[in-house]
Regions:
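Positively charged n-region of N-terminal signal peptides that target proteins for export
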Residues: 1-4
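Short beta-strand edge/turn micro-motifs at domain boundaries
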Residues: 130-160
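A solvent-exposed, acidic/Ser-Thr-rich amphipathic alpha-helical stretch
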Residues: 31-35, 53-109, 127
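Hydrophobic/aromatic beta-strand elements that line small-molecule binding cavities or substrate pockets
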Residues: 80, 84, 98-104, 116-119, ...
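Short, low-complexity N-terminal intrinsically disordered segments enriched in polar/charged residues
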Residues: 18-62, 78-79, 160-170
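Bacterial N-terminal signal peptides
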Residues: 6-16
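Short, well-ordered beta-strand segments in beta-rich or mixed alpha/beta enzyme
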Residues: 65-69, 110-121, 135-136
């Protein structure tokens, strides 16, 4: 019992000795991994928004699992790309909502990316939908590919969110 109390106290003090840089990295909002995966997010969704499906496809493993709260589960890269061609191309544009992106490492594998995004109708320019997302990225050498995607919490954008989206476009 005499040993347990000092050991418990030492364990409780460990988190308080973390540096500011460690805290930023632990928050998922900065650092080299954040920069890398944020750049991947920009590149993959640039391809998505331009309907460059050949490039878009390269960011998914062949057996990707894509879980969508409204659309169900998609089990392959080919089906993800086909769904994008059928339901997205020329109709919708995706925008990352500033300040929502978080990225965390997965030891000896890659990273988890989470955030919120909005979807804007190409015809009207209105950003009417908002959703949360999680993407699991696998690193193989210099290549990064998504193995799992969750897109959930889809809802209509509030008036305030629609105004913020319109302001961001100008």
């Amino acid at each position: 019992m005499k040993i347990a109390a000092p050991l418990l106290l030492a364990c409780l003090m460990l988190p308080s000795t973390a540096s500011a840089a460690d805290t930023d990295a632990a928050s998922g909002t900065s650092g080299p991994l954040f920069d890398t995966v944020a750049a991947l997010d920009r590149t993959v969704f640039d391809a998505y928004n331009r309907c460059d499906l050949e490039t878009f496809a390269t960011y998914f493993v062949p057996d990707v699992e894509f879980y969508h709260d409204n659309g169900g589960v998609t089990w392959t890269r080919e089906d993800v790309v086909e769904g994008t061609r059928k339901y997205i191309c020329g109709k919708v544009r995706r925008e990352l909502i500033p300040g929502t992106l978080r990225i965390y490492p997965i030891k000896d594998f890659g990273a988890v990316e989470e955030g919120e995004h909005r979807f804007c109708q190409r015809a009207s320019g209105q950003c009417e939908g908002v959703a949360k997302f999680v993407m699991v990225w696998r690193r193989e050498g210099e290549a990064w590919r998504m193995t799992r995607v969750l897109s959930y919490g889809h809802r209509a954008a509030s008036e305030e969110e629609m105004r913020a989206a319109a302001a961001a476009q100008h």
